[in-house]
Amino acid sequence: TAPTIILGTGGYSNIPNVPGLQEAGYLSSESLFGDKFPKQPYKSLAVLGAGPIGVEFGHVFDAAGTEVTIIQHNVRLVPKEDEEMSEHLLQNYRARGINVILNQDTVEIRQEDGLKVVVTKDRTTGEITETKVEEILVAAGIRPAVEELHLENTGIETLPKGWIKTNEFLETSVDGIYALGDVNGEPAFRHRANYEADIIAHNLYFAKNEEDFRWARYDTLPKVTFSYPEIGSVGLTEAEAIKAGYNVGVGKNYYSSTAKGYAMGINPGDVNDGFVKIVVDKDTNHILGMHVTGPQASILFQPYVNLMNSGVTPLTAINEEI
């Protein structure tokens, strides 16, 4: 026993219950970097799932010369990103020769002639597709590592998918027990876990009273997908802002419209012509979200992360600089 317990057990790859998957064998983001790391690139690979992990590994293997097929349950790649980011990534992957199959249920996996056959069904039309590959990589999301905690023996509440439920101070439903990182929900980013650890440490050891407590907020949590092209984003997508009831304004600027883009040989209309998209509240001039896709996107969006965390409006910031 202890007066304070902090749970940070992380998460595992979510392995879907697909008939034949266990018998055929598969890779995950964990096992790939262990005993199953290939001595040479696979000739062909099917990636099941197209969130950040799926599209990142799809890019890595494609760059190594593997014939890659990405099979996605959703109608979009990286569906939690802004829709225009997803569409731009799809166009670029297909232009590179990556086979992307969207809106699919994986119904069966079998072995045939030394290969693995992934059988999928279109969720709208019911059309069956068979994809023969040398290897399969499962990238179907993250599940919390809670099995060995035996939470059923405690009063700790969990969410429908098994994540540990916490309040704004990262405390569970049991006083004195906290949870941080992948175990308390998505998004599964290391910097989110670091941020939550800072909050818990401050509140437990440095706050003099409850008025000094810090609380977790994720509306300006930045994230990057290291696909090709990269995607960097912070805040609300355009669709999320509209759904939230804001008077939404959108601004876009393409790489081809800048000196840097011109120097890189990017022309208007090129499939690799990335862009910056800013979503604002027209009533207050506050930035609600910023999204960028293209070379060095992970660097380009950082000033907007700082600006959104500062709370100032773009017009105010510009005037102060002047």
Where are these regions (language model features)?
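Glycine/serine-rich phosphate-binding loop and adjoining beta1-alpha1 elements at the start
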Residues: 1-25, 29, 43-44
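Short hydrophobic core segments
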Residues: 2-10, 47-48, 68, 131-141, ...
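Short loop/edge segments at beta-strand edges and connector loops
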Residues: 9, 28-30, 102-104, 160, ...
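FAD-site-proximal beta/loop scaffold in flavoenzymes
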Residues: 22-41, 130-210, 305
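Rossmann-like dinucleotide-binding cores of NAD(P)H-dependent redox enzymes
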Residues: 34, 42-46, 52-127, 187-194, ...
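Short loop/turn motifs at secondary-structure junctions and domain boundaries
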Residues: 112, 148, 155-157, 264-273
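Short, acidic, Ser/Thr-enriched surface-loop or helix-capping motifs
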Residues: 123, 159, 167-168, 238, ...
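Flexible, glycine-rich terminal cap/loop adjacent to redox cofactors
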Residues: 226-322
